[in-house]
């Protein structure tokens, strides 16, 4: 009897997932929401996207390329990035956009390892020498739920890549962003920031390590960084906003262990419930190019709309302290 009940429950769950999947498949799919626009909207604009070879970053790059932007893909694995760039050029050509030679929207691949401050500095030095302007910086790359490892500089990996690497990158490019104004900075965070806390006594997780907590902490740091940066950029005509993309089907969760027998059901449920990368990228695209947010800075967005933050994400004293400590950690000298 117990076995029959379990089997019935599993069949019911599977049937429900199939029904939802069918609804998702047959219902209207608004792939391009408010973040979309006409080809040419970003013509003449240079956009840097970190982690642009897969997932949200790739979808963001594809759409901004379609809109006519010159897109710089800052990626850790150059070979994979070159492969993705080739696919994006071909897709754009097939869709009737720019030709394979990139005469309208352009793609440039550059190596950038956010787990290495040396790599970040080398990347910025090269970019500052080669690029006369930078209109949009999208801090998209990230790691999630990885086992305890450290960056090249000895930082806990999730905090080091998700926060510190982008902190240094942004600071080194601020001069170019200011000279290119009006310009925008877009920071990709997560709703999971709600479960994070900034423990200044153990930012490197030497005392204890929890994958989920450390990811949430890094995403909370993204928001605090955005709000403090917005305060510092007042009057410069450079804006910075932060977003959550929702739950998206990407390879970001590759470190999450799912039992073998549960994988088919998980894959089906994720297909039914999770956003596609293009759907998840809409808020990044919206903040990068929409006239609706011109002059808007220091705000938190989801689904192309402003959302409220928990008080801990708006704590100005914590944001300032995190900024000061981050400057020391990455070696920025005043």
From Swiss-Prot:
Pfam families: adh_short. It is an enzyme of class 1 (oxidoreductase). GO terms for molecular function: 11-cis-retinol dehydrogenase activity; alcohol dehydrogenase (NADP+) activity; all-trans-retinol dehydrogenase (NADP+) activity. Substrate binds at residue 190. The active site is at residue 215. It catalyses: all-trans-retinol + NADP(+) = all-trans-retinal + NADPH + H(+); 11-cis-retinol + NADP(+) = 11-cis-retinal + NADPH + H(+); 9-cis-retinol + NADP(+) = 9-cis-retinal + NADPH + H(+). GO terms for biological process: retinol metabolic process. GO terms for cellular component: cytosol; endoplasmic reticulum; mitochondrion; nucleoplasm. InterPro entries: NAD(P)-bd_dom_sf, SDR_fam. Gene3D superfamilies: NAD(P)-binding Rossmann-like Domain. NADP(+) binds at residues 51-57. Its EC number is 1.1.1.300. Shows clear specificity for the pro-S hydrogen on C4 of NADPH and the pro-R hydrogen on C15 of retinols. Retinol dehydrogenase with a clear preference for NADP. Displays high activity towards 9-cis, 11-cis and all-trans-retinol. Shows a very weak activity towards 13-cis-retinol. Has no activity towards steroids. Belongs to the short-chain dehydrogenases/reductases (SDR) family. This is Retinol dehydrogenase 14. It comes from Mus musculus (Mouse). The lineage of its organism: Eukaryota, Metazoa, Chordata, Craniata, Vertebrata.
């Amino acid at each position: 009897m117990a076995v029959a009940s379990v089997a019935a429950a599993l069949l019911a769950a599977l049937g429900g997932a199939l029904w939802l999947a069918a609804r998702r498949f047959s219902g209207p799919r608004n792939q391009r929401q408010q973040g979309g626009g006409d080809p040419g909207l970003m013509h003449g604009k240079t956009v840097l996207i970190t982690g642009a070879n897969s997932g949200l970053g790739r979808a963001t790059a594809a759409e901004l390329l379609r809109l006519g932007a010159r897109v710089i893909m800052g990626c850790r694995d150059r070979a994979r990035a070159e492969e993705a760039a080739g696919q994006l050029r071909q897709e754009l050509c097939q869709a009737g956009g720019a030709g394979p030679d990139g005469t309208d929207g352009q793609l440039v691949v550059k190596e950038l390892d956010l787990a290495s401050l040396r790599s970040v500095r080398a990347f910025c030095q090269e970019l500052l020498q080669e690029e006369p302007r930078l209109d949009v910086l999208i801090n998209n790359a990230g790691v999630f739920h990885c086992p305890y490892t450290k960056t090249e500089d000895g930082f806990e990996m999730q905090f080091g890549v998700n926060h510190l690497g982008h902190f240094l990158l942004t600071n080194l490019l601020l001069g170019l962003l200011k000279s290119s104004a009006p310009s925008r900075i877009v920071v990709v965070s997560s709703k999971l920031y709600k479960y994070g806390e900034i423990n200044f006594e153990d930012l490197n997780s030497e005392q204890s390590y929890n994958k989920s907590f450390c990811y949430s902490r890094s995403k909370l740091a993204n928001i605090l960084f955005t709000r403090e940066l917005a305060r510092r950029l007042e009057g410069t005509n450079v804006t910075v906003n932060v977003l959550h993309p929702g739950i998206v089907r990407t390879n970001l969760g590759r470190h999450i262990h799912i039992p073998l027998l549960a994988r088919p059901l998980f894959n089906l449920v994720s297909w039914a419930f999770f956003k596609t990368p293009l759907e998840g990228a809409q808020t990044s695209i919206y903040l990068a190019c929409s006239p609706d947010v011109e002059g808007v800075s220091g705000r938190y967005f989801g689904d192309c709309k402003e959302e409220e933050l928990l008080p801990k994400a708006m704590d100005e004293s914590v944001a300032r302290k995190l900024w000061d400590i981050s400057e020391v950690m990455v070696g920025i000298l005043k």
